[in-house]
């Protein structure tokens, strides 16, 4: 049987995308779909969507170029940050350990209060996760990003900024590879940490399907959004599809479109 990471890696190679640390074993099927690319054109922006129908080893993408371009992960990094926090004991219980508000009033009201890990990931509370990263520290953070083979694994630019304004980059194929391993519980950390993070991921019901996903938005805290992400997986009956979407956000009115266009693309590939 073909390993899922191998299938993703060969998709990257066959698509003439930048090389990654995936083994060179044949994948089964891949498709590029113009109708997915049109979703971004209709929004008046550019972006990419990649869906991975795991039971079929079928990878469906909107393009061959942007799907292999590394970007700052923004708040999608809250997923690995949460795993590392639990694994290192920085957080023991996502529903009990309290991160006190620092008293600084920020433009996003949901950030201006105390949080636990579950509420912090739901509110995408950047200050909480910056404090988590500081408590994890440079050495442990680097250790786990290396273990996860997460993006370019470069945490330069500050322990509380590297995923927002620093050196970390990840592309949609790499996002899918990481998310799929979390979904299956095969990351090189405890089952408990992975189960808890799967449980706290925001979930959205769409008909008889469920989307478990984390958004990201570069520039959110400055009120100057520039890049939007949505990564996660969709469940419909026994069918599961891992996905990653990113798009240029050219106007604040496009911020909600991160989920809208993701749902449209998932529907287009019959994942929801």
PLM region spans:
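N-terminal export signals
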Residues: 6-26
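Beta-lactamase-like hydrolase cores
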Residues: 22-72
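Structured C-terminal helix/loop/strand segments within mature extracytoplasmic catalytic/sensor domains
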Residues: 25-37, 70, 134-137, 183-272
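Short linear capping/connector segments at secondary-structure termini
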Residues: 64, 98-104, 156-164
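Active-site SXXK
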Residues: 70-95, 120, 243
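Short, well-structured active-site flanking segments
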Residues: 86-103, 189-193
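Sec-exported extracytoplasmic/periplasmic mature domains
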Residues: 86-90, 122-126, 133-138, 146-150, ...
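Mid-domain, small-residue-enriched loop/turn segments at the edges of structured enzyme/sensor domains
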Residues: 109, 113-117, 129-184
